[in-house]
Amino acid sequence: MNRRTGVKAAALAAAGALLLSACSTSTTGSDAGGDGSALTVGTTDKVVALDPAGAYDNGSSLVEQQIYPFILAYKPGTAELNPSIAESADFTEPTKYEVKLKDGLKYANGNDLTSSDVKFSFDRQLKIQDPNGPSSLLGGLASVETPDDTTVVFNLKRENDQTWPGVLASAAGPIVDEDVFSPDALTPDQEIVDAEAFSGPYTIDSFKFNELITYKAYPDYQGYVEPAKTDSVQMRYYSDANNMKLDVQKGTIDVAWRSLSATDIEDLGKDENLTVHKGPGGEIRYIVYNMDTMPFGAKTDDPDEKKALAVRQAMADSIDRQAIASQVYKDTYTPLYSFVPDGLPGANEALKSAYGDGQGGADVEKAKKALEDAGVQTPVDLNLQYNPDHYGPSSGDEYALIKDQLDKTGLFNVNLQSTEWVQYSEDRTSDVYPMYQLGWFPDYSDADNYLVPFFYDTDETPSFLANHFRDDQINKELTDQASTADKAEREKELGTIQDQLSEQLPTLPLLQGNQIAVSGKDVKGVEETLDPAFQFRLALLSK
């Protein structure tokens, strides 16, 4: 015990003194489950899959947060992590992170939840490595041991991994029922629902894929988030944000949560029966380049790395982010000039000085020179894909303006196309789109989460982008920063990585935005869940 205590203290000091102890709030049996009036929440976010191994998107993550147990959870209103189904969670050695589970954990189907389920959950993520899944977050995990039914030891590749507690509360962290889920393939949605493989604040009572989910409070929930204040919550999925706007105005739904247009938000803010809630911003929007299929990409008929880079650089020189933020989003978004959003430790504005006029604006002559110096004939044909439903109704206007900005330079001829989200998710990882829109909502509040999933790429841990960008030096630096205990030194390392990425431009960051929800005046709890953890907790809502 003395050895354990001493090592734990040293490790936690190195990890920023994150203290995770059994003093967290927990709930059991008869205390759980609210009796508030039923609520209906609307969203345009689509669900890709209920299986956590096959989904790494905002719509699917929202569902996971309601129905699955996590080892750690964020305290509402903060980015502070606490044990959830764990009694405790700490480093016992620099590369060993030990979790003690609470006794008597069960899934809604009656199956015991033990350390075996925890090991199973992480092992299957790494084995399946679905291109739409979050396995890229587990690049720092070497193996999982289970000394007994309530003890889990995570063997980590990096000493004092600064990010591991956040990973446990992320999209890679749901603990699934090993008696229901396949160990080496995705489990179909309906099988999960029929088997009642849930142990979060809610279970799923009924399920119609991307139409309607009815949640029911789980009475035996033992996680950190308080018992659900409302016994029954419906999540209604919209293909058209205008219909969602009309429904929240009429009171057909109680909350509209992602994504309304900036014009709609402005309009709804004038309705005396509604409240517009705003929370901390962590969302980013960006263009992804497929290094194989973009103009002059590695697998095109005319591969040329120098020319491909020049095309990316010239696009960066030609985009006016402020115009997009103001004209399309009425400044509910702000320009993003790096790969990490402003406000996080380590963020810089590497792209602002490197491209365009050096002040954030476009510079067509600079773009023209970049292409000329590389021997690129103009105009360059660009096939640019965007998604009209997942990232909000203004995506069409956003990408129409991007097309207009690029076309007006005379250097590009943009062919703009759109695809709905479920198909889009499959296509983008199958080399269908040479360049395309994506957005990002963080798994945890750290610059690492805007870098590692995108740009750390190995055979064992492919990147989430699947865009064929791989740089061994950046891989090494991403690994090193995660275990750098000195805050100032780590921020310096993060800045260096962003500078290097700005030279290669595997993606083109565009905007960052706030969390916004609209609710009826009688709805409580919305403000509490719009917090730096970026998790929308239905359990906090009531009316």
Where are these regions (language model features)?
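Detector for C-terminal structural segments
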Residues: G34, K208, L212, A217, ...
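N-terminal lobe/hinge region of extracytoplasmic solute-binding protein
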Residues: G42-E93, D123, A197
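Aromatic- and charge-enriched surface segment that lines or borders ligand/interaction sites
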Residues: S88-P131, P147, V153-N155, D247, ...
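Surface-exposed binding/hinge segments that line
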Residues: D90, S135-F181, S206
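Gly/Pro-rich hinge or "lid" segments in bacterial periplasmic/extracellular proteins
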Residues: S170-V225, S232
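Ligand-site clamp/hinge motif
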Residues: D220-D267
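Structural transition elements
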Residues: T334-D373, H390-S395
